A protein has these predicted regions:
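Long, low-complexity ectodomains and other extracytoplasmic segments of secretory-pathway proteins
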Residues: 4-9, 63-129, 133-134, 190-204
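Surface-exposed binding patches on compact interaction domains or structured appendages
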Residues: 8-38, 135-164, 168
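Short beta-strands and strand-coil junctions in structured, solvent-facing domains, enriched
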Residues: 10, 45-49, 66, 136-137, ...
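Well-ordered beta-strand positions in beta-sheet-rich domains
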Residues: 12, 28, 38, 57, ...
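C-terminal soluble interaction/assembly domains
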Residues: 126-133, 141-145, 151-187, 195, ...
């Protein structure tokens, strides 16, 4: 990612504690006015030792000459999958197959505070299903959403051939001011589609 010094003095970039599975480099560490630098982030999946979606916050501090230090965070997210490069055609023929009931979950117009219909616990919910249409067990490493306004529950971590799991998606309308457009990431061991995306939409 790029970073630019839009001020009139030099700016030095400092990083906070970096997770052990990340290698982060800032070049250059000190930017001159209007200079563009780069922050390079590399993730080592072998060091991480787990599969699925990984999200973390990287603290960053910027110190400009004669000014108060400014701090913030960079959100880093990645999907870690199996290495399918050595699978033969026969292996793939026996592999699990993840089938989703849909790739779009539309909640439509959300009720507001003045709505006549009361909300149960102030929430609305919907569901989607994942079915294993393959010949071997389907492992679901993670089902996540980076948007904190979306809660996920239910489902299973492993599905036998022919089995189906139901996942519940819950929204809190009071936290959505105008509209919501978010993605649910499904990471699994289906070699033909290890990462599946489900779009969630809602509006006021």
């Amino acid at each position: 990612m790029c970073i630019r010094d839009r001020g009139k003095t030099s700016a030095t970039i400092h990083l906070g504690k970096v997770p052990h599975y990340l290698n982060v480099q800032v070049n250059p560490a000190t930017l001159q006015p209007d200079e563009v630098g780069a922050i390079t982030i590399l993730m080592d999946a072998k060091v991480l030792k787990r599969k699925g979606r990984v999200s973390t916050l990287l603290p960053i501090m910027i110190q400009s000459a004669g000014k108060k230090e400014v701090s913030g965070e960079i959100q880093i997210s990645a999907n870690v999958t199996d290495n399918f490069s050595k699978l033969s055609a026969a292996d793939k023929a026996q592999a699990p197959i993840a089938e989703l009931s849909g790739t779009l979950l539309e909640f439509g117009k959300l009720p507001n505070k003045k709505s006549i219909v009361p909300l149960i616990g102030g929430k609305v919910s919907g569901t989607f299903e994942i079915t294993n249409a393959g010949k071997t067990p389907l492992t679901i490493y993670s089902v996540t959403c980076d948007d904190e306004r979306v809660d996920l529950s239910g489902g299973k971590k492993e599905l036998k051939p022919g089995a189906t799991a139901t996942f519940k998606v819950t929204l809190r309308p009071k936290e959505i001011k105008t509209k919501l457009e978010a993605l649910i990431n499904v990471v699994c061991n289906d070699p033909n589609g290890p990462i599946r995306l489900i779009k969630v939409t809602a509006y006021k």
